[in-house]
Amino acid sequence: MVSSLVNLKACFYSGRMNTTTTTTTTTAPSVAQHGSAAGLGTAERQYLMADDGRHLAASWFEPPTGAARAVAVVSSAAGVPRGYYRAFAEWLAGRGYAVLTYDYRGIAGSRRGPMRQEPGTMRDWAVLDMSAALAAAEARRATQRLPLLLVGHSFGGNAIGFASGVERADALLAVASQVGEPRLYPGVKRWVAEFFFRAWVPGLVATTGHLPGWAMGPGAQAMPGGVARQWARWGRQRGWAFADPAMQPYRSASALTVPVHLWDVSDDLTFAPAAAVDALAEQFRNAAVKRLSISPAQVGLTRLGHFGAFRRDPGPRLWERLLAPIEAATPRLRFAG
């Protein structure tokens, strides 16, 4: 049972801001390393500030040559550091996008002090941290009226529906983003998920003050206690966060009237099965929603899974498939790449 539980991390993830730049600017690796004909962007570390004053680590990736023709914000899966999306951000910058990645409070570069003392919640990640990232993107694009593409992975694509400023986006591309509700998961995985949310997570948080990384599998990041408790509460209720009365004032998914492309990964049955992605599609009721699916075979692999879409391999072979349809469906993005 425990071996099944510790592999469930990604399954059920599913403010205005100021920026202060650091002095660190790095140049991306060579194009040959990524198998892309396009040049790759350069990265600059920054800090965002959310409405409550919390500083968040972030990185801007700029096109290697010429001015940016569009802006993209990449919102991570729950607990996943922004560095995981670096290769994708570099590639996207090479296509002419200015790309923002960022860490939620309590995660990686946005962590301060011992994890058990981190006061953040999932509500904070969506309402404060995502909103801060969108405000940064708005400031970056406002003077040139650049188009804005939102990219979300897992939690980053479902919780964006609570962020302030989402209505100003030109398109949303979400990969393996879902409604993290156990009834939507197939077979025995549903019952494992029920135990995960009703006993495993609450018990560990009560004992340790946070959710340890080892409790979710090899390489997983620890989560603040407040985040884990809210995650478990949402997983125990029908409708996930979208049914939480406390989240209703922040619901903004219905404000999107632009193209929204929601991708499932065919072999991601444990983490974001098609039914869970379908349930998320219902939240964007006023958008031009399109449901799509990608399989490992389409990019020359035998396994892709929940996290494979943002790895360097398959990298551009897959990213082209994800980006081309949303650019084609969004007039302002057609000349971005």
Please place each PLM-identified region on the residue numbering:
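N-terminal cap/lid segment of alpha/beta-hydrolase-fold proteins
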Residues: 18-19, 29-62
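Active-site glycine-rich loops that stabilize anionic/oxyanionic intermediates
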Residues: 77-80, 266
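Conserved alpha/beta-hydrolase
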Residues: 82-84, 89-114
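Alpha/beta-hydrolase active-site loop
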Residues: 119-140
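Alpha/beta-hydrolase-fold enzymes
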Residues: 151-239
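Short beta-strand/loop motif that positions the catalytic acidic residue
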Residues: 256, 262-264
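Conserved alpha/beta-hydrolase "acid-adjacent" motif
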Residues: 269-275
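Catalytic active-site module of serine/aspartate enzymes centered on a nucleophile-bearing elbow/loop
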Residues: 294-337
